[in-house]
A protein has these predicted regions:
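Acidic, mature catalytic/reactive cores of soluble proteins
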Residues: 1-276
Length: 276
């Protein structure tokens, strides 16, 4: 059920590269729910959607619309439900992608490396949770394991959108193997909490992001100053790379806002139930 890269060779051959990475999970990003009340206002568009779905089915092309009728919302997605469930199993596995501070950019199953033979030459990679070990990609920049805030933010959004369609009908284990069932809205919030926790003080008063910087952990003048690192250690959430990457790591503010709105909704619902 996972999405993998494929190398297209000059001689027409295709070589699968079975690396479980954030690239395979990014198929979740292209997700949109078309609400029935909106579709009722544009009947011609609805009619063309039906033609589009039938055309792709007839020509055996990958479906973007899995279910289509006149009475429900419509989900546009590259990932059908059966495949989504398999992707979520990997996404929420602590031995694969799920870390205390978010989703790793490469599965931890590649700790011992992955390689592929191409015309007698071997190419490979392995899980690297923090700084990269190669200078080929700009020195300390590394997409082979660490948590990157902007990509995680897109996952949080995608999961919330999928929840708006599936609601409580789709339940997954959180984390995988725990027996604890959650809907995708709860998964979205859990992921948001993990990302926010990177900057929060733990029980010892330490912020994971500042793990290697005693001055920012203990000094009274600096301990409450938060640095927005480029990316974060895939196992312990330590800040890595440029420490001034506010441009994308600052999106954590949107996640704090999301969690606050969720809490307000819960409180209002509880008050309403008490009145009833």
């Amino acid at each position: 059920g996972f999405f993998y890269d494929v190398l297209s060779m000059p001689d027409g051959r295709y070589i699968p590269v079975k690396v479980r990475s954030l690239v395979g999970l990014s198929t979740l990003f292209a997700t949109l729910v078309l609400k029935k009340d909106m579709l009722d206002k544009v009947p011609d568009f609805h009619r063309r959607l039906k033609w589009f779905q039938q055309y792709r089915e007839k020509n055996q092309q990958y479906l973007v619309i899995e279910e289509l009728n006149d009475h429900d919302d419509i989900l546009l997605s590259l990932v059908p439900k059966s495949r989504l469930e398999k992707l979520m199993k990997a996404l929420l596995d602590e031995n694969e992608f799920l870390s205390p501070g978010g989703i790793r950019s490469i599965s931890k199953i590649h700790e011992h490396g992955y390689s592929v033979d191409i015309d007698g030459q071997e190419f490979g990679l392995d899980y690297q949770p923090a700084e990269g070990t190669s200078a080929l990609f700009g020195g300390n920049s590394n997409w082979r394991g660490p948590v990157w805030m902007p990509m995680n933010y897109l996952l949080v959004q995608a999961l919330q959108t999928l929840y708006e369609y599936h609601n409580d009908e789709l339940q997954v284990e959180l984390p995988t193997g725990s027996g604890n069932k959650a809907n995708l809205g709860e998964v979205s919030n859990d992921l948001a909490k993990r990302l926010v926790s990177i900057f929060e003080k733990d029980t010892n008063g330490m912020r994971p992001a500042n793990m290697d910087h005693p001055v920012y952990q203990h000094n009274e003048h600096f301990k409450d100053l938060v640095l927005f690192y480029e990316y974060f250690h895939g196992d312990n959430s330590r800040g890595v790379g440029a420490s001034h990457q506010t441009g994308w790591t600052g999106v954590v503010a949107e996640l704090i806002n999301k969690l606050n709105k969720t809490e307000v909704k819960k409180m209002n619902k509880k008050k309403h139930e008490m009145v009833m």
